[in-house]
Amino acid sequence: MIRLETRFASSFIQSSKLEPFLEKSESARLTLHSSQGQGKEYLGWLYLPKELKNSEIERMTQVAERLRNSSEVIVVIGIGGSYLGSRAVLEATLPFFKKPSIGNPEIIFAGHHLESRYFSELIEYLEDKNFSINVISKSGTTTEPAIAFRLLWELLRKKYGSSASSRVVATTDSSKGVLKKFADSEKLDTFTIPDNVGGRYSVLTPVGLFPLAVAGISISKFILGFQNILNDIHSITDPTRNPATYYSALRNYFLSEGRYIEVLANFNPSLRYVSEWWKQLFGESEGKENKGIFPASMDFTTDLHSLGQYIQEGKRILFETVLSPSEVCSNLTLKPTQDNLDSLNFLSGNTLGYVNEQARLGTLLAHADGGVPCLELVFPDISPQSLGELMYFFEYSCAISGYSLGVNPFDQPGVEAYKKNMFALLNKPGFEQEGETLRKRISRN
């Protein structure tokens, strides 16, 4: 079970002021389970860990194994919730350094930006390698992944001719959309994105599960993590004992105290993309109607040598939540040297994991002393099962926190603003008039 520790934040919390936020969080949790809140049509994720079909899991595993056995590289194409969840788990659990091969392929991501050098070098990199594609898009028309798939499909056809289709798996809508139409015409293997699950809550659908399977990660253990924590946090009604409700209450309490930035920090570089996934989850869910906490992330101890100064002595507008796995790799022991030129012999006999843990504790003490409340999210280890628990904890907390704020945590209307302007500037049919207006504005500036 995930624990939320407040030992480095308790001095910033007044019980009498926190109480209304605890009550509001529990009320929001009940609203979530009543299926009567805003965005109720997108609650498919809530009970999904109990509803997954073994037949679908087996089919994903079989198709993934086929791609693994024919590919040195598998390119996962998607943006936002279509790639961040799987990338978070892959980056956290796969070795930092490995030599890819057929049967043990390298996983590369594309379609999450529009930078031309990246695509030019990716195409060149793939030209002499056996590769396959998992393209993920509900509609098939999202600009970034659509462009990526167009470019890589062209290369795939050039390399493999009529057999190219056997190297593409599409994760898309069950019955409609451009990608679904293309998949049917090319007879691609397909997996379905449920209509009642939004992108940022979709890591337990084929959106997240299939890329894990092609990477060789046990999706059954990942699913087990979701199932285990669901049974706990759905049943605990005391908001001080339910870590998800408590986290939601504390976040909104700190917001009311003028702390409108939350820093999700980690002391393990493998957790960096967990933070990236978390930023989308909370940013898109809460950042609307001029409300919400701004989600930021930092990688320690690296960022202590850049942003650490601001946290220690800058404007007191933030609080920290620190990802704290209980078990970390500790098999590297520091040995003494005869001359001790670096003056590090005092560390001899200690593992590097122990040194990193003392850095974590020292940082939390320093930041709390500097006026920054620091929460700790304690979970067992960095494994697929523990990450499953952590991700469901965040999804559940985010929905509760959004309802507590009075916003719909399942839509993202503001995302369309940049798309509309981009389409107009690119002369997309139907946007010509807006394009002229925007170009005039740009020229005046």
Curated annotation (Swiss-Prot):
Localisation: Cytoplasm
Q: What class of enzyme is it?
A: isomerase
| Pfam families according to UniProt | PGI
Provide the active-site residues from the annotation.
E284 (proton donor), H305, K419
InterPro entries attached to this UniProt entry: BTB/POZ_dom, G6P_Isomerase, Phosphoglucose_isomerase_CS, SIS_dom_sf, SIS_PGI_1, SIS_PGI_2
The alphabetized list of GO BP terms reads: gluconeogenesis; glucose 6-phosphate metabolic process; glycolytic process
Q: Name one GO molecular function term.
A: glucose-6-phosphate isomerase activity
Coiled-coil residue windows: none
Q: Which domain of life is it from?
A: Bacteria
Q: What is this protein called?
A: Glucose-6-phosphate isomerase
